[in-house]
Amino acid sequence: MVTRIISANTSEILKMDGTQLKQSIKASEGRTVLSENVVTEPAIDNLTTSEIAAAFGADLILLNLFDTLNPKVSGLEVDKPENTVKKLQKLTGRPIGVNLEPVDEKAEMESTKLQISSGRTANVESMRAAEELGFNFVCFTGNPGTGVTNRMIAKAVKTAKKNFSGLIIAGKMHGAGVDEPVASEESVKEFLDAGADVILVPAVGTVPGFTSEELINIVKIVHKHGGLVMSTIGTSQE
């Protein structure tokens, strides 16, 4: 058996594989906190946002806008770029994950589409790079205006099962500029069937029309299939 992530020390946490990390989170019974950190600007010179988040109690750190093919975290000095994630794990004592965005070139956009680098996009190369860098988990989601769809998230999960050994999180915090439901029972089932470990959904009240009833129904579906649910605030209400 594994130690709860809220009780585990650094050496225990960083030894966990994807399956063990999932069980460690499950055993913590809803008290696990993940902090998403933008890596392009440090909060303070020579100090990463991840270190600050860990100091304030984050159990998991998720890097946003991180390019897996050009690894760099502002505020972090490393001898070699390939050691970026390992050093951040050592400094924070936390599992480190990365956002990869399953962009849909055919998406019906509600706003101007933003172009992102290949190292931020969900593809075989970026997933293998995430594996080589030592990330503990990946999160398939979309930043505003990137054109990420639930259809492509499900496809990315299937690809990740063949190219990444860590925990897999899947879902949208907001629309990512696309005209489709942010979270639905149908898309959740697709993510689970594809092999997702954790389903990401928006917190109630953070996006228009996502209700408590919908969240409860999704949680029941995910738990029935042995998965976990992460309720997120990714739209600045925090």
What are these regions (language model features)?
Residues 31-48, 102-124, 170-186, 230-238:
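Active-site mouth loops of central-metabolism enzymes
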Residues 59-71, 132-146, 190-208:
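Glycine-rich phosphate-binding active-site loops on the catalytic face of alpha/beta enzymes
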Residues 198-238:
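Catalytic alpha/beta core domains of metabolic enzymes, predominantly
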Residues 10-26, 44-47, 69-88, 144-165, ...:
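Active-site-adjacent beta->alpha loops and helix N-cap segments on the catalytic face
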Residues 26, 50-57, 82-93, 127-134, ...:
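Acidic (Asp/Glu)-rich catalytic clusters
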Residues 36-102:
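Non-catalytic, usually N-terminal nucleic-acid engagement modules in DNA/RNA processing proteins
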Residues 106-159:
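Hydrophobic alpha-helical segments and helix pairs
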Residues 31-37, 61-63, 94-102, 138-140, ...:
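Hydrophobic faces of well-ordered beta-strands that scaffold small-molecule active sites
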